[in-house]
């Protein structure tokens, strides 16, 4: 039984539509190379809440909260070819999307 190679691509962004759009573009590129693909798998959204004082030095009771949601998608590619990797390397992702690739 041969060992299957796989690549995991994790996309992160504060904008969910940007993550979904680029996940679909990556899937379209990989489908052209006849590799098996799973995804995009939505991972849990993390919300980061930051609390700051409204006043510079007094009124501790007066605060303001800011929240940022971090959206993630996971794409798995099974048995990638050299052509698959070349096409993935040629993709130019926008600055708002963070990409993490593991093999």
From Swiss-Prot:
Gene Ontology biological process terms from the UniProt entry: translation
GO cellular component: ribonucleoprotein complex; ribosome
Signal peptide: none
Keywords: Ribonucleoprotein, Ribosomal protein
Family matches, as InterPro entries: Ribosomal_uS10, Ribosomal_uS10_CS, Ribosomal_uS10_dom, Ribosomal_uS10_dom_sf
Molecular function GO terms recorded: structural constituent of ribosome; tRNA binding
Pfam family, one: Ribosomal_S10
Family: Belongs to the universal ribosomal protein uS10 family.
Subunit and partners: Part of the 30S ribosomal subunit.
Entry function: Involved in the binding of tRNA to the ribosomes.
PANTHER family to which the protein is assigned, alphabetical: 30S RIBOSOMAL PROTEIN S10 FAMILY MEMBER
NCBIfam families associated with the record: PRK00596.1, rpsJ_bact
The protein's name in its UniProt record: Small ribosomal subunit protein uS10
Species, as recorded: Chlorobaculum parvum (strain DSM 263 / NCIMB 8327) (Chlorobium vibrioforme subsp. thiosulfatophilum)
Lineage of the species this protein comes from: Bacteria, Pseudomonadati, Chlorobiota, Chlorobiia, Chlorobiales
Gene: rpsJ
